[in-house]
C-alpha cells in the first residue's frame, strides 16, 4: 500500500505565501506605475496645448496653429520660445546645483541599466519645463522624450515610497519608462521591447511581467481618455514585381541621406556648443527655426502631419528637403 502524499505543514507554507505576496505587491505597483505614466504623458500633452493656445490662440495642432498666424508672429515665437527655454535651463541649473543631487542630470535609461531608481528631481523638472516652452512654440525637438522622462520620474517617486527591495524599485522605474513610451507613441508592445531589450540589453526575469502589466495599464487608460489614431496615415499601395527593387533602392538612398543628416546635426551641435550662454544658444536656434517657419509653417512640431502628407504623395521633394 502506497504511503499517502505528504501535506506540507502550515509552518512550511510561509516561503510560498511570502513569495506570492511579494509578486502580487510588485504587480500592483506596476499597475500604479502604468496609471502614473498615462497621467504624465496626457498631462504634458495638455500643457503643450495650453502653451500653444497662449502663443497662437489656436489648439488644433502645431502646423495648423502656425498656418493661422502671420510669418512675423511665427518668427518671433521661435525666437522667444528658444530664449525662454534657455532662461529656464540657465536659472534652473543654478537652482538644481543648490539641491541635494547637484546640477548633474541622471538619464533614466542609464539609471535603469545600472540598477538604480533615483532620478535628479530638480534637473528633471527644469528640463521638462524648458521642453514644454520649446515644443509649445513650435520647436521640432519632439514631445515624446519629455513625456517618457516624466513617466520615469513619476515611477521613481512611486518606488521611493513603496516597501520594495532596490531591485524591485528599479523594476518600477523600468515600468515607468515602458509606460511612457507606450503612451507617447500609442505602442505598448514597442515600449516593452524597447525597455527590456534595446534599453536594458537583456530580459531580466523579475521585470518582464511588471513591465507588461504597466504598459498594458497605461495604454488602456490612454485609449479610454482619448481615441488614439495612427501616427501616420498610410496609403493603399498595389505591389507589382518591381516593388522589391524600388524598396531596396529607396532603403539605400534613405540610409545615405539619414547618415548625411546625422552628420549635419553633429556639426551644428558642435558649432552651437561653442556658445557658453544657454539663453543665447537656444535663443539663436529659435531665431533660425523661426525664420524658416516664417517661410514654411509646416516645419513646426515633430513632423507627423508632414510625413503623412509625404506618404500620400501630396508634398513635393523640395518641401521635404526644407
What positions do the PLM features span?
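Alpha-helical transmembrane segments and immediately membrane-proximal extracytoplasmic
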Residues: 1-322
Amino acid at each position: 500500500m502506497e504511503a499517502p502524499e505528504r501535506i506540507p505543514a502550515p509552518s512550511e507554507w510561509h516561503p510560498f505565501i511570502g513569495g506570492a505576496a511579494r509578486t502580487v505587491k510588485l504587480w500592483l505597483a506596476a499597475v500604479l506605475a502604468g496609471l502614473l505614466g498615462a497621467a504624465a504623458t496626457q498631462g504634458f500633452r495638455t500643457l503643450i496645448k495650453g502653451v500653444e493656445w497662449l502663443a497662437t490662440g489656436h489648439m488644433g495642432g502645431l502646423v495648423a496653429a502656425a498656418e493661422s498666424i502671420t510669418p512675423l508672429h511665427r518668427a518671433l515665437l521661435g525666437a522667444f520660445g528658444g530664449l525662454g527655454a534657455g532662461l529656464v535651463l540657465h536659472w534652473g541649473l543654478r537652482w538644481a546645483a543648490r539641491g541635494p543631487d547637484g546640477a548633474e542630470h541622471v538619464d533614466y535609461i542609464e539609471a535603469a541599466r545600472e540598477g538604480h531608481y533615483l532620478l535628479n528631481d530638480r534637473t528633471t523638472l527644469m528640463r521638462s519645463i524648458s521642453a514644454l516652452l520649446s515644443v509649445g512654440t513650435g520647436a521640432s525637438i519632439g514631445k515624446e522624450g519629455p513625456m517618457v522622462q516624466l513617466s520615469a520620474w513619476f515611477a521613481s517617486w512611486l518606488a521611493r515610497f513603496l516597501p520594495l527591495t532596490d531591485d524591485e524599485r528599479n523594476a518600477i522605474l523600468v515600468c515607468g519608462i515602458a509606460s511612457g513610451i507606450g503612451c507617447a507613441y500609442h505602442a505598448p508592445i514597442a515600449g516593452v521591447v524597447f525597455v527590456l531589450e534595446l534599453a536594458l540589453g537583456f530580459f531580466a526575469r523579475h521585470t518582464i511581467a511588471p513591465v507588461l502589466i504597466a504598459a498594458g495599464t497605461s495604454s488602456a487608460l490612454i485609449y479610454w481618455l482619448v481615441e488614439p489614431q495612427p501616427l501616420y496615415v498610410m496609403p493603399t499601395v498595389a505591389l507589382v514585381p518591381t516593388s522589391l527593387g524600388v524598396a531596396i533602392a529607396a532603403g539605400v538612398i534613405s540610409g545615405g541621406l539619414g547618415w548625411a543628416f546625422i552628420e549635419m546635426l553633429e556639426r551644428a551641435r558642435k558649432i552651437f556648443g561653442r556658445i557658453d550662454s544657454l539663453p543665447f544658444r537656444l535663443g539663436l536656434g529659435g531665431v533660425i527655426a523661426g525664420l524658416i517657419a516664417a517661410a514654411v509653417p509646416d516645419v513646426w512640431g515633430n513632423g507627423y502631419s508632414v510625413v503623412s502628407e509625404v506618404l500620400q504623395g501630396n508634398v513635393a521633394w523640395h518641401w521635404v528637403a526644407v
